[in-house]
Amino acid sequence: MRSGVIAQKVGMTRVFTETGEHIPVTVLKLGNCQVVGHRTTEKNGYVALQLGSGSRKTVYMPKAERGQFAVAKVEPKRKLAEFRVSEDSLIPVGAEIQADHFVVGQFVDVTGTSVGKGFAGGMKRWNFGGLRATHGVSISHRSIGSTGGRQDPGKTWKNKKMPGHMGVDRITTLNLRVVQTDVERGLILVEGAVPGSKGGWISVRDAVKKPLPKEAPKPGKFKVAGEQAAEAPAMQEGA
């Protein structure tokens, strides 16, 4: 199981195929996505990579957090996230993951925070039908109607769909196809829409419900400080 990456949503555009077909894509940018730390079974009880992306001024950081980045010898990051990996997919601390960590044609799962809509009624939030336009209904055409029974159960059940705050939820979209990658600019183009607003932080990982292509680099495609980008050595059979 490979690591994912932290990216920022740039926006949407479209690309054209050789046959003239246009594909709507979302542009995701890798902003110096580096490995900040390891989580091991001996010390933490599980195996994972802690990644960081973006940049942050140290003046606004707690001293303990500054020390964490100093030990890893990486510049302070604005966004941190952990990705569960297998033991043979650990990437060295300080390595920068490249855009060609994902190959064209493979499927990925993306996770982000949806756009906030504020307070919304039942018709907008839950797609309720509302009340009738006439026949005695006045003022409350867009209300949700009854919310519970009479004597039995005599209450409104928990988790009843009602008006309330809409958006700002953690949303995962499954099986988006990678259309194109740009290593020099750190861009990943995925087909379709990605949750969140422009500039929002997005987690991208290999699709859980789709097979990983054979040409996908293992444990990943990364660049160590002071070296050119190179694919990590593959694990030998039976190792």
Curated annotation (Swiss-Prot):
Segments for region (Disordered): 140-164, 211-239
Modified residues (N5-methylglutamine): Q151
tRNA-binding recorded as keyword: no
Gene3D superfamilies attached to this UniProt entry: 3.30.160.810, Translation factors (2.40.30.10)
Keywords: Methylation, Ribonucleoprotein, Ribosomal protein, RNA-binding, rRNA-binding
GO biological process: one example: translation
Complex and partners: Part of the 50S ribosomal subunit. Forms a cluster with proteins L14 and L19.
Function statement: One of the primary rRNA binding proteins, it binds directly near the 3'-end of the 23S rRNA, where it nucleates assembly of the 50S subunit.
Name this polypeptide is given: Large ribosomal subunit protein uL3
Organism listed in the record: Bradyrhizobium sp. (strain ORS 278)
